[in-house]
């Protein structure tokens, strides 16, 4: 709590927010920070109040079907009182609608789209006075198989916002000019007042609570507009705060490109090729878009149409045996929750779980692990079951300190026998010399007989802290070096 940024926090404390026997994931804070929404049993939308820890159901799980974890979608309203969510209504689970549901748990909901096509990824825009979403109602589709092209649409919940959105460039310019004149008059009046009172007024304005949203749903179907000029295989989309431009990722040729549609100029242009599909987040000023794609972060500068990678480092302790153990239990539990029927072929799923779990300690690679999982899932005698694995990418290279060690030394640490010329340990000001014992690498003790190579994994070219003992002088000291 004392750190300014979570990213650079020196100490992290984790504790469970929701404790129950149900599968719970995909949390999202409310905009006012008072509550957290999450999915229970993959499809039930629930909310926990952070103050009293009471949990309520907002959208019953019967209104959705989860084919794979992560395929559900919902979003808080700006006033923290409503949700836009995925919803199975008249089109079946392959053609979902968008539902507006009240967050208080009353069950009040409205099917906003009612199209019979696939409507997805609804987002609040224009301060909650409208929503944008993707729909395949106008796109090409494969009638004999799967897949369809999408468009981005907008639906207005407020008549004034709808009228303002449709203003021409000239009409918008006149409106902006009137606003500038009005703001100038107010500024002149404020300048005549006491400065302290003016500051108090600004503080009061800054702390003004978000006004509850009001919806004119009766006229919503007359306030729907198609925003994209042609259907395509779409990624994410972002509407600017002013509502004058739409940025979206679309794939026409090789991969996803970033496009811009200017509503006042009625122009569509390609901004950046090959940005990749993913999720886009605009900054508060609307000057940049942050794209999360393929495990990478990118910053897109809208004005200059430039994209910059955002470098980050997130190290973790890789324990493949523990990872396989987790995946095994996750697989077994998911079958139990989503697929298993006690009457299916007389299968004892609990018994099979215990029987196949015994193989885990004897498996040391993912190829054999995938085979074992496939055999266990095969006991179900059901279609479309099995497991596969991806070949591991190149493991991080093990760095070298540029020294030979005494193989006859049996104590803790690494006793240096020879230092290689022009290596990491030959700095001009170093006190490390043959005969010294490296006791720790980055604070981790080197025990006798233990493999020290993992301590240098991926450390090439990075600062590494060595804790060294010199038996000749009885001195202990620390030095930073860059292994190669």
Give residue ranges: language-model regions.
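C-terminal, low-ordered peptide segments at domain boundaries
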Residues: 172, 305-323, 426-427, 447-484
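A short beta-strand motif characteristic of beta-propeller blades
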Residues: 13-18, 56-64, 109-112, 225-227, ...
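Blade-terminus and WD-like Trp-Asp/Gly-His loop motifs, strongest in beta-propeller folds
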Residues: 27-35, 74-83, 122-130, 237-244, ...
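A flexible loop/linker signature enriched in serine peptidases of the S9 family
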Residues: 1-6, 18-24, 34-52, 60-69, ...
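Extended, small/polar residue-biased N-terminal targeting/export presequences
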Residues: 361-412, 475-479, 484
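Terminal targeting/pro-maturation regions of precursor/exported proteins
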Residues: 142, 306, 311-375, 379-380, ...
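A short helix->beta-strand "capping" segment at the edge of beta-propeller domains
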Residues: 8-18, 213-231
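PDZ/PDZ-like domain segments forming the peptide/carboxylate-binding groove
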Residues: 396-449
